[in-house]
């Protein structure tokens, strides 16, 4: 769907995944899964979620940078027979995002039954590249799930399934033209991690992570996709008309700590620890105006400088259990809808250290932001993982460092961070945070601050003063790009000239002896 207002009706259906076998499902505007929503950065998205289910639901816009009141977490319930009007500015770069239910203790069951759909965001940077983007022609959604079907056709909520579905279809195939094509991969499974690659070793050229374009395509024969993660890959099928390729998941290559391996202690499945087919690609004739050349560069997006971080938080994952059950905690805490676990300042940059002391890998998701993976146990992540993300798989015994900026306020409704194994999430491996707007300019506050800035907001010149000697001041835009650097040489005061900069927020960092202070400066 590409329109001004999206109407998403969530309902109960009877659907046949296999001929003659009826299965009760939940779907969005149809029996299983929902429409792909096409949005453009800078536009205003308007959505109406209508609940025709016999139970409460909610809808989360996974990966989208939206205020807390529009995020659709477990607090934002939509009762049976009710609806929810959603409105937000599309603030994400071009990429693949998705929507799914998020009611507490019902997320896994509703997602299992079929409530989910993709969101594709386009922007000027992506549109300037020669990439496949004809939806359903050379640009394809690929939602990968596993589901368990009982003899009576029912589809229970389970950590693992024995049937693989792609876009809701078992034994799926896809007709692709003999040219460069684009696959938008999404792991929509409850718990299984897919280790994707082609049976014949065909290379995939990764162009995005969860949150937008990489700097350049990354060529690989394997791509590990954990729950909620997305990657866009290009395949060069030029000259292969009439051939077919088989996309596989190489479960035999998964570590014992990763759901989907052959770990015999956990729940069993016929697919665990084996290599199994996911999707057959049948190569057809090229289109009249094919993309035939792989790009060499994509985007200049980069992580924020670590020096901009105002705080480092440590999140320790603990507990033991099964893939579908157990008691797993974050910093010794479990979800309580009445407890706010963290408070952040709007516009601030933070580093999170996530250490996994539990017995299995957890795909960790943070609402409302994109982050960059700085390192895994001190080692830089693989190239395809160096773009913006919102889900990261943290293996047992591993510490992953992330950097992120909180760009939207809570607006009265907390954001979540949690394990995206949906059964762990429902079992309360989830905490809440709020993002508070910073007050930037009352004379009383400025006078009381150890380092004062005035006027703030400013029409051009902002003056700063400290009681202690200062070394330097730097000014950055909100993406972390350095704009101004001034050596202060022990002075206790100085000024920044923002007259040449466009209106908006900026980050000023003042460094003294053994300490530093970061403030948001508003240019009017």
Residue ranges, per PLM feature:
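Active/binding-pocket-proximal capping segment
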Residues: 200-211, 357-387, 422-423, 435-437
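A glycine-anchored, Pro-Gly-centered beta-turn/N-cap motif
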Residues: 95, 179, 348, 413, ...
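C-terminal substrate/ligand-recognition segments
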Residues: 314-373, 390-412
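Short, surface-exposed ligand- or partner-binding patches at beta-edge/loop junctions that are enriched
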Residues: 97-102, 238-254, 409-421
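Edge beta-strands of extracellular beta-sandwich domains
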Residues: 257-261, 430-433, 516-523
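C-terminal outer-membrane/trafficking sorting elements
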Residues: 443-524
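Short coil/turn motif common to extracellular beta-sandwich-like domains
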Residues: 40-44, 177-180, 346-349, 456-463
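Histidine-centered copper-binding motifs that mark active-site loops
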Residues: 1-234, 255, 264-320, 392, ...
